[in-house]
Each structure stands twice: as structure tokens, then as C-alpha cells.
Amino acid sequence: MKLILLGAPGAGKGTQAAFICQKYGIPQISTGDMLRAAVKAGTPLGQQAKAVMDAGQLVSDDLIINLVKERIAQADCANGFLFDGFPRTIPQADAMKAAGVKLDYVLEIDVPFDAIIERMSGRRSHPASGRTYHVKFNPPKVEGQDDVTGEPLVQREDDKEETVKKRLDVYSSQTRPLVDYYRAWAEKEAAAAPKYRAISGLGSVEDITQRALAALAE
């Protein structure tokens, strides 16, 4: 099972990726983890990536694609792999296609932006313990206070509404076009292209997992 998981920030990709990887016995590969592992291992590509990052520059798509090819050739990818957060852009998708990286599925977890904003901006946390709450879905017993200590809860910078909206804007302009890219490719070249599937990311975690696994069994 070789697949790409697409979806906006806050759509629940990380949670579903864990279930899918467990079901199929495949690793979850993110470019960040892949880069860190290559740098740590000191491979020639890892050394190139380190030099670029140390200079404060972005790693080129060519180098990323070469790292991807190196990563998916490893033994733990014998049964496949799940790409999380890659490709991010059309040029990266084109480069992956040109490099002959074969995929079985592209699975999109679709959640309306207003639901994502509500989901993320309602999160509150107790920094000392790591306990998390949600003002609507999992509220503390006393508003704004941790259930155990009574200490004030905080909203992380990443969860503030304006931050969430900015991240969704970036997703809309850079990554959302990939949905159309893979959908169009699947319609045009059904035999060569990965199967494109979209599922709703609304509802319970269990419901979404069932939808995801059913889509990957089609």
C-alpha cells in the first residue's frame, strides 16, 4: 500500500495516518522526519541537505525527491509507505511523477474550513501537565481552569484563530491544487495514476478511520 494523505491543517491527518500505517504495516514518512534522519545518518544526500539548511536556505525539490527515493528503497518500505505532508506543491508532484515513484492511492480527508477553525481555535491546554481541553467538545469543569490544579488554561499560538486562518490560506494556495492535480490524473490515465479517494473528516475518530480503510479497499 503506497499512498499520499492529503488534507488541510487540523483535518486529522496525523491521527488517521497512525491507524492506516498500523493496518498495512507501513511507515509514515514526512519530509521533516526524513530530512532529520538523513542528516543524522550522514548519507551523502543528508550532508547536502544539512549544508543547505545550515545556510538558512530551503531544500530544493530535486534534493527532496532524491531523499524520497532513498527512503522508500529501505527495508521497512517493502509493503509500502504513507506520505504525510508531501508532496506540498504541484512542482513536487510533477517531480515525483517524473522520478517514477509509484503510488496506489491519494486519500484526501476533507473538512470544511469553518469546522477546522472551530476545532483548532477552541483548543486549550494546561502547560505544566500537557492536559488538553476544548471549549466546546471537551470543556474543563470550570471555564478557563485546569480540572486537577485549577490553574489557568492557555491557548497556544498555533491554535489562535488568525494563525489557523493564515495556515489555511497557505494550504489553499499551495497544497489544495494537488487535490485537483491527482483527481484529474486519475480521470485521464486510470491505469497509470494512483486512485484518488476523498472522505469526510467530520464525525468521530472511529467513523473517519472506517471511511479511510473502506476507501483504500475499493
Curated annotation (Swiss-Prot):
<keyword id="KW-0963">Cytoplasm</keyword>
<keyword id="KW-0418">Kinase</keyword>
<keyword id="KW-0808">Transferase</keyword>
<dbReference type="Pfam" id="PF05191">
    <property type="entry name" value="ADK_lid"/>
</dbReference>
<comment type="pathway">
    <text>Purine metabolism; AMP biosynthesis via salvage pathway; AMP from ADP: step 1/1.</text>
</comment>
<dbReference type="GO" id="GO:0044209">
    <property type="term" value="P:AMP salvage"/>
</dbReference>
<dbReference type="InterPro" id="IPR027417">
    <property type="entry name" value="P-loop_NTPase"/>
</dbReference>
<feature type="region of interest" description="Disordered">
    <location>
        <begin position="127"/>
        <end position="151"/>
    </location>
</feature>
<comment type="subunit">
    <text>Monomer.</text>
</comment>
<keyword id="KW-0545">Nucleotide biosynthesis</keyword>
<feature type="binding site">
    <location>
        <position position="167"/>
    </location>
    <ligand>
        <name>AMP</name>
    </ligand>
</feature>
<dbReference type="InterPro" id="IPR000850">
    <property type="entry name" value="Adenylat/UMP-CMP_kin"/>
</dbReference>
<dbReference type="InterPro" id="IPR007862">
    <property type="entry name" value="Adenylate_kinase_lid-dom"/>
</dbReference>
<dbReference type="GO" id="GO:0005524">
    <property type="term" value="F:ATP binding"/>
</dbReference>
<feature type="binding site">
    <location>
        <position position="36"/>
    </location>
    <ligand>
        <name>AMP</name>
    </ligand>
</feature>
<feature type="region of interest" description="NMP">
    <location>
        <begin position="30"/>
        <end position="59"/>
    </location>
</feature>
<feature type="binding site">
    <location>
        <begin position="132"/>
        <end position="133"/>
    </location>
    <ligand>
        <name>ATP</name>
    </ligand>
</feature>
<dbReference type="InterPro" id="IPR033690">
    <property type="entry name" value="Adenylat_kinase_CS"/>
</dbReference>
<feature type="binding site">
    <location>
        <position position="92"/>
    </location>
    <ligand>
        <name>AMP</name>
    </ligand>
</feature>
<keyword id="KW-0067">ATP-binding</keyword>
<keyword id="KW-0547">Nucleotide-binding</keyword>
<feature type="binding site">
    <location>
        <position position="31"/>
    </location>
    <ligand>
        <name>AMP</name>
    </ligand>
</feature>
<feature type="binding site">
    <location>
        <begin position="57"/>
        <end position="59"/>
    </location>
    <ligand>
        <name>AMP</name>
    </ligand>
</feature>
<feature type="binding site">
    <location>
        <position position="203"/>
    </location>
    <ligand>
        <name>ATP</name>
    </ligand>
</feature>
<dbReference type="Pfam" id="PF00406">
    <property type="entry name" value="ADK"/>
</dbReference>
<comment type="function">
    <text>Catalyzes the reversible transfer of the terminal phosphate group between ATP and AMP. Plays an important role in cellular energy homeostasis and in adenine nucleotide metabolism.</text>
</comment>
<feature type="binding site">
    <location>
        <position position="156"/>
    </location>
    <ligand>
        <name>AMP</name>
    </ligand>
</feature>
<feature type="binding site">
    <location>
        <begin position="85"/>
        <end position="88"/>
    </location>
    <ligand>
        <name>AMP</name>
    </ligand>
</feature>
<feature type="binding site">
    <location>
        <position position="123"/>
    </location>
    <ligand>
        <name>ATP</name>
    </ligand>
</feature>
<dbReference type="GO" id="GO:0005737">
    <property type="term" value="C:cytoplasm"/>
</dbReference>
<feature type="binding site">
    <location>
        <begin position="10"/>
        <end position="15"/>
    </location>
    <ligand>
        <name>ATP</name>
    </ligand>
</feature>
<protein>
    <recommendedName>
        <fullName>Adenylate kinase</fullName>
        <ecNumber>2.7.4.3</ecNumber>
    </recommendedName>
</protein>
<comment type="similarity">
    <text>Belongs to the adenylate kinase family.</text>
</comment>
<dbReference type="GO" id="GO:0004017">
    <property type="term" value="F:adenylate kinase activity"/>
</dbReference>
<feature type="region of interest" description="LID">
    <location>
        <begin position="122"/>
        <end position="159"/>
    </location>
</feature>
<dbReference type="InterPro" id="IPR006259">
    <property type="entry name" value="Adenyl_kin_sub"/>
</dbReference>
